[in-house]
């Protein structure tokens, strides 16, 4: 995964937490770049990335941060059956890199995934 195109830029995240939901907003140099929302009751994830920031590896970082935030908030992150091809591709890439693992439809962030996030921005 790469973020070379934005090297030197500062990534930051704002998170919101509900009883069974989380939201993560990603900013690049203070500019809104995208958001991740997860509802544990329905198992639905929603990811939006501003077109300006697409094809730079940021969607994968946002998804990884979203899964990490859900798990750290005490929510089980289950696979969303209504996902898009782009979401599937990002999840496959994260799994292939060893950053997430699927255990019987429950997804977990690995130690390598956590270290990758730490390199991108403080958790």
Regions found by a protein language model. Give the residues of each.
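Proteolytic processing junctions in secreted/extracellular precursors
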Residues: 3-8, 119
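Conserved GNAT acetyl-CoA-binding A-motif
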Residues: 70-83
């Amino acid at each position: 995964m790469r973020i070379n195109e934005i090297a030197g830029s500062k990534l930051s995240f704002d998170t919101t937490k509900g009883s069974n939901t989380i939201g993560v907003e990603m900013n690049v140099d203070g500019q809104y770049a995208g958001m991740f929302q997860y509802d544990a009751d329905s198992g639905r994830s929603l990811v939006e990335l501003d077109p300006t920031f697409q094809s730079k590896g940021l969607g994968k970082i946002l998804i990884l941060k979203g899964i990490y935030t859900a798990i750290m908030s005490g929510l089980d992150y289950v696979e969303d059956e209504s996902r898009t091809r782009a979401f599937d591709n990002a999840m496959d890439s994260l799994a292939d890199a060893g950053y997430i693992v699927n255990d019987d439809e429950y997804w977990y962030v690995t130690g390598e995934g956590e270290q990758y996030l730490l390199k991108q921005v403080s958790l």
